Amino acid sequence: MYVELVDETGQVPSEIIEQTKEVLAFAAKKLDLKESTEMSVTFVDNARSHELNLQYRETDRPTDVISLEYKPDESEFFFDEDMELPEELLEEMDPFIGELFISIDKAAEQAADYGHSIEREYGWLAVHGFLHINGYDHYMPEEESEMFALQEEILTAYGLTR
């Protein structure tokens, strides 16, 4: 999987950037995503996170991670409105699945609050957002249980334990 990483803050250590790429590639293999899959991750500060949270979620505060899932629109590729395409073909034509925005301020706060390493927190946020992009959610108790169990399984197998 290809992950484009952007550090808008200029403060994220190169080790965290590499870890983020690696843990997302690891998670992609766990979900059996194609190697051609692409996504982006942008590291932001709380001010930018607040702005994005307001824009995309209509929530007036910063948050730790914002996940924007991308679904290709077949109308961008074909003019025949009556033609329906299999999802696999759409994925091949546009392998970009979405983007994450991770707040470095929230990552530092939460690592301290939860008493684990900053590496663990960045990994947690990346995998959490990645799972959202891939259809997982935690609004209902059974969804939360499934998503959080998978998230912990990925992080533990990768080596980011509490």
From Swiss-Prot:
InterPro entries: MetalPrtase_cat_dom_sf_prd (IPR023091), YbeY (IPR002036), YbeY_CS (IPR020549)
SUPFAM superfamilies referenced in this protein's UniProt entry, alphabetically: Metalloproteases ('zincins'), catalytic domain
Subcellular location per the Swiss-Prot or TrEMBL entry: Cytoplasm
UniProt GO cellular component terms: cytoplasm
Swiss-Prot/TrEMBL cofactor(s): Zn(2+)
Note on cofactor: Binds 1 zinc ion.
UniProt name for this protein: Endoribonuclease YbeY
Gene responsible for this protein: ybeY
